[in-house]
Amino acid sequence: MSPVLFEIKDSIGFITFNRPDKLNSFNREMALLMQEKLDACKSNEVRCVYITGAGKAFSAGQDLAEVADPNGPGMKAILSEQFNPIVIKIKKLEKPVVAAINGVAAGAGANIALCCDIVIAAESASFIQAFSKIGLIPDSGGTHVLPRLIGWQKASALMMLGEKVSATEAEKLAMIYKVFPDEIFAEEAMKIATTLAQMPTKGLAYTKQLLKNSVNTLFEDQLHDEDIVQQKAAQTKDYKEGVNAFLEKRKPEFKGE
């Protein structure tokens, strides 16, 4: 069985971590396959990406058995060849990426999730920056993303103490978008992905680009960037469809063009 499942349905690229017996922890095969599936999501056939885990976990991060193997990849390779390309690809995808957290998201698993555009979680899910427990630092973009989501103090405490954060607390901290009761989680997650897949894909991609760039941009420069990108958005077929649908008082039919 493949450690990463992939399917395109209704314009959504579904990526499922599939090592449930290992809490979907990553080994080299799984990490490289994840990169391959993210590349497949560049297709115009995909207008939204949906990432989740099989079984009881989203992902427990790096498989420590591989780290302990003297014949396994070293730490440099694990980061530069396995995890870093994953989060970079997520950030660069020109479409929304939804992380549907069905269980524990730990270590690199948590940070892969937090690098996604919209993170939703089941009530029973949890997040933990487990690195400090074994003498490592948070990787996979964690030290960049988490303090920007929840602030320096809280991020420092969670990363240094390695405390588990429930999905409910994560929502209160603005670490994630929304939490749902377990019994309706899958249904609600699908509603969000379906909505995004039916929206103007290029407009969403431009929004994602501007949000990402805003981290290191001065206000006046951001206004300039908005000016340029808005002109591009106004040239899309979906913009024209949106305006026409509004004037004609009908539901728009966006094509992602």
Stretches with model-predicted labels:
Residues 15, 19, 33-34, 51, ...:
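Terminal peptide-recognition signature
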Residues 32, 53-89, 105, 218:
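Glycine- (often His-adjacent) and acidic-residue-rich active-site loop
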Residues 30-34, 79-82, 112, 185, ...:
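Hydrophobic alpha-helical membrane-association signature
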Residues 1-54, 88, 176:
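Conserved CoA-thioester-binding segment of acyl-CoA-metabolizing enzymes
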Residues 158-160, 210-214, 229-234:
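Helix-loop "lid/cap" segments that line or gate small-molecule binding pockets
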Residues 89-204, 235-236, 241-244, 250, ...:
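Crotonase-fold acyl-CoA enzyme core
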